[in-house]
Structures are given as structure tokens and as C-alpha cells.
Regions:
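A structural micro-motif
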Residues: 36, 72-73
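Aromatic-acidic/polar surface patches that form glycan- and anion
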Residues: 17, 56, 126-130
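Short alpha-helix
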Residues: 55-71, 77
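Short, glycine/charged-enriched secondary-structure capping and boundary segments
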Residues: 23-26, 53-56, 92
Length: 139
């Protein structure tokens, strides 16, 4: 791929499947045009998937520091999720999906409980129990 060819590179739920993420960051930086964007997401609290090729879980701090390390500017990372009960539901979903009605009730209860807890906690719960992260890094 020629250098500085693309305005944007999209990378949704791929990075955790690549053992050489350092090469990915440098290669994406190389192929993005000046002022281009590297946009993507990674799971965090989520079951292993596509095994045996699910290598990493990346934290907010890791994404911010490593994208900057590889020369990206204006790095923004946003937590995805809702709270501890939705995080628990997402881990149980592979089993709950076989009981669709029960699964929907569990999901509703999880949203209600997370909303109730959020009333009493000052910290945004998705910052403590992120299902994943969405990021935008500008060249």
C-alpha cells in the first residue's frame, strides 16, 4: 500500500486479533494522509472470541499512550458500556442467548440495576466497567 494514501482507516474489533499491534500502529500511521484519522474500537470486558487468535485486551491508558507513542495527535478514547450488571450480562450472553425470553428479562434487570446504582455513584460506571473502547487518533 502506498504511503499517505487514505484519509481514514477503520479498525473495529480487529486489533485484539493481531499479535503484532506495534506494526499495525506504525503501518496505519504510514498509510494515512496528513490530518487523516485512525478510527476503531476494541473490546475490554468481553469473552474470548475467535480463539485461538484473540491475543489482547487494551485499556484506555494503553490506547492513549501507544497511539501517541506512534506519533498520532489528538487521541480521543471513549468508554463503551453502562455498568457492572450490563458487563456481567455481556459475559453471560453466549449462554443466555439460548433462552431468549429469559435473556431479555436479564438484560432489562441489568439496565435497571445499573441505572439505580448510577444514582448513588459519582463516577460514570462505564469508566469502571467498560465493555470496550472507541478511539479516534488524528495524524
Amino acid at each position: 500500500i502506498p504511503s499517505k494514501k487514505y484519509n481514514n482507516v477503520l479498525f473495529f474489533n480487529i486489533l485484539e486479533h493481531l499479535p503484532e499491534y506495534k506494526l499495525v500502529f506504525s503501518e496505519i500511521y504510514r498509510i494515512i494522509k496528513k490530518r487523516g484519522n485512525f478510527i476503531g474500537s476494541v473490546p475490554f470486558i468481553y469473552q474470548i472470541h475467535a480463539a485461538p487468535n484473540d491475543y489482547f485486551r487494551f485499556s484506555r491508558e494503553f490506547l492513549e499512550s501507544n497511539l501517541k507513542k506512534y506519533k498520532f495527535k489528538k487521541v480521543k478514547v471513549k468508554s463503551l458500556g453502562f455498568g457492572p450488571f450490563i458487563a456481567s450480562y455481556s459475559l453471560l450472553y453466549p449462554y443466555l442467548r439460548y433462552l431468549p425470553f429469559f435473556s431479555q428479562i436479564c438484560l432489562l434487570v441489568a439496565y435497571i440495576l445499573d441505572g439505580f446504582i448510577q444514582i448513588f455513584v459519582k463516577t460514570d460506571l462505564k469508566e469502571i466497567f467498560p465493555l470496550g473502547y472507541f478511539f479516534i487518533a488524528k495524524k
